[in-house]
Amino acid sequence: MRSTAYLTALLSFLGATHAAPEGPRCRCTPDQSCWPSPGLWQTLNKTLSGNLVAVKPVGTVCHDPTYNGGLCDSVKGMQTDSSWRSAQPGAVQSINWETWPEKNESCYIDGPRQVPCGQGRIPLYSAVVQSPLDIQKTVRFASKYNLRLVIKNTGHDFLGRSTGPQSLQILTHNMKSINFTDNFVPEGKPDGRGIGQAVTIGAGVQLNELYEAAGKRGLTQVIGLSTTVGAAGGYIQGGGHSPLGPWKGMSTDHVLEYKVVTAGAKFVTANEYQNSDLFWALRGGGGGTFGVVTSVTLRTFKDPPTIVSQVNVTMDGKANESYWAAVEKFQAYLPTLSDGGCSGYYYMLPNVTLGPQSAAVIIAAFYYANKTDKAHVDNLYRPLFASLSSIPGINVASVSVPVSSSTEAFRSAFDQKPPRDGGGVNILGSRLFSRKLLEAPGGAANLTAALSKLDFKNLQPAIGHLVAGGQVAKNTHIQSALNPSWRKALVHLVISRDWSIDSTFAEQEKISTKLTAEEIPLLAAVEPDMGAYTNEADVNEPRFQQTFWGTNYNTLLRVKNRWDPRGLFFVRSGVGSEAWDKQGLCRA
């Protein structure tokens, strides 16, 4: 049987002990004699056809002694443009990951001009790669000189995995190929027969680019709801939730093949038929850990008609018992919505203050893939709306519109040009919650009680992602490294915290520590064994191995040690990262 052969191949190397051999205790840094000379960097630049860049933070032009008024004005105008940020070697989307607070190094674009810039976590050099061969050359160089290596696709990582201090960056952003096929044949498939429609995308392709290309062909694929997130990077390698998830499953469920440059600088194919252990790990085990993915092949589907729906639940004044009663009823009804084909996102904002007015709201953006009957949605909502409207002070409104395709539905949701969702401070905490919990007596009440104990600043939401259940739950036969809790989950719930750019390190630590030690445990206690989604979670999660991967972690670590025995690839709270310090510079 296919599944038996696949599992046998995956486990074939597990009979022996696979402890990673010890390399040097610390990476080489610029203050050491082992650091490559200028001549060696110049040689690498030549082998990369002039595409090696000495990187400075993008805010450098706004600070003395390198201040440039014209360039600073230009950078200030683009600092929230996530498309611009994704293309810059010296920037990521969340600016807290550009800084190195422990060293008091930052370079905020809006910081005081007279404060000199520090390099922070921004890499010192970037290989702006154009091909797998460029990546192989860069990996060999990093390995030979024992350098800290960082992979950046778009810099959307919420756990700071796209930056690293005193490092060499591989920037895959320019690898933009998109190739569709009517009948994809995985490399090495014994019978040579195709397995259906698919698209192969380069490492730098972003979600909006893939939606546009597929939409022109009347196709879609299971990917996220964003403009500039990279489709082939950490998003899909960490699992990849999607508003199409309940219809078809997780994004990683539909990966047919990866092309990868390994820690040994080999260019390999990973699929069900060859290097199947690596294929398994890359389907949920996290990005930046097992190799540099150069391309991904995904299943495509006929783009379905979709109903787009918005639901607003509001009350005047800040959150009180009525508001939290509405939140409880709303969340208790989520299994029914899911059964009706609903997916999407709901934003719980207990504190919305605009001038003298204040309110507490729930705003939901829902999608009904492969549905055309608006009456179905209206009937589905009727019991929920009646229940909510019975709560004193609660008002409910909704609008639902059928559109011809999911691509039209999703692209209209992020049609802002340029996309203005980058350049902020952002740390996350999250937990997965099961359908079983929400259906159980008191389950939604317990979750709501935990939420009500959190601190919410003005306009600060808790975001519920109704992206599981349905086919995500049914795809248990798919063998991947995805956190098994996804197959039981219905909701992925996220909270975020921030601070101002003039906050001291002590103030930042206080906010971060409170998130880790107080707020997330409140949510985790509601359903302790469910864990969290590795791509959108707290970077300081104390038991990240179990929280992000559950029973899959030990196997993932063995795969990691097989393909990267000396730990060339490192990301914060990634597989094998417990062997290193937080910055990946010295072994723990």
Swiss-Prot record:
The keyword rRNA processing does not apply. Residues 1-19 form the signal peptide. It is found in: Secreted. Its EC number is 1.-.-.-. Its main location: secreted. The modification Pros-8alpha-FAD histidine is found at H156. GO terms for cellular component: extracellular region. It is an enzyme of class 1 (oxidoreductase). Gene3D superfamilies: 3.30.465.10. One of its GO terms (molecular function) is FAD binding. Glycans are attached at N45, N104, N179, N312, N320, N351, N370, N446. Keywords: FAD, Flavoprotein, Glycoprotein, Oxidoreductase, Secreted, Signal. Residues 118-303 form the FAD-binding PCMH-type domain. Its cofactor is FAD. Belongs to the oxygen-dependent FAD-linked oxidoreductase family. This is Uncharacterized FAD-linked oxidoreductase ARB_02478. It comes from Arthroderma benhamiae (strain ATCC MYA-4681 / CBS 112371).
